[in-house]
Amino acid sequence: MKPKTGNNANGLRLLTRGAVYVAVVAVFLVGQAFTQSPTPGSDYELKRINLPGATGAVALDYFAYDRATEKVWVPASNTGSVDVIDEKTDAVSQITGFPTGEIERHGKKITLGPTAASIGNGVVYIGNRGNATLCAVDAKTFTRGECVPASPDRDVTPDGVIYIAATREVWITTRPTLGGDPAAAKSLQVFDASDPQRLKWKSKIPLEGLAEGYAVDNQRGLFYTNIEGPGKTLAIDVRSHKIVAEWNPGSADLQGLALDIARRFLFVACGDHVVSIDAGHDGKVLDSIRTGAGLDNIDYSADAKLLYAAASQAATLTIAEVGNDGKFHLKDTVPTVKGARGVVTGKGETAYLIDPAEGRILKLIRK
């Protein structure tokens, strides 16, 4: 996503090509969490889960929920760690030892490290902006395996990381490194993940602009992403790596994506609203719902047929039901905190939001 702690100048040329990082993984539990007062009239409440080692703001971006283990993986960038939250107990395990790098942006120094997570086949893939690498971590033991460069050249660093189960590949959206060629980041980097623990760079897919957000339909072999600048949403065939459709969601401020695979509704975050697109019929815009300003990643629960969209500036979480016609029906608007953005769904109607300013996760619970 568009990092709120630095965008295009967010990587360092620190990695020797082909290097493999071997590190001791330190894991400990943090059980401190408290529930804020429920909002009158709302069916939901928020529980605050503090991240270990966070004494202030933490650069948080892409995080992920592993349905097989019922754990939430949170790359806590500037702490040099990845934090794993147990959904049942809210205990937090910390995987340490990820390299960080210091960059300068707008005259200020910023420390970045791991910033993106994606659930793979028994592993979790971690993108690290601090040293422009992609690492595999065992989903059960939390043991960190091999780390590889995010690209054959040194001009790009990972943004979003996506495991494509249909082809056993990992795709990453990218941003330029500090001093790197901005044009190099206008592509998707593709890795062979047939051996889940040992990624191998495979190819890149050229794009018209920077990719922003993603959603994957493994059933039909389609990958969706937004393109900054032109304001387009693309559908890409995961086997041929060819762009098969381009749609206009009606906004130039495109953020995250979510997908109802069964009904083929694609949801596009557009700054202060979300649109519903008919991905099965030429990308027709079916509906739109206002959320307030400051959207980033959104998510969708296929089981509950609910869309979740956190607006950082409005400090609200919009929860909307999606009908069989692709139209939204507002279910609840839950007050959050300023800066809370990005959401992933857990079991049932549980969801998680990132709160970078306070270095914590907000857990949404139905009363």
Mark where each language-model region is:
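Bacterial N-terminal signal peptides
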Residues: A19-Q32
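Predominantly soluble domains enriched in secretory-pathway, periplasmic, or organellar proteins
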Residues: F34-K367
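N-terminal secretory signal peptides that target proteins for export/translocation
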Residues: M1-T16
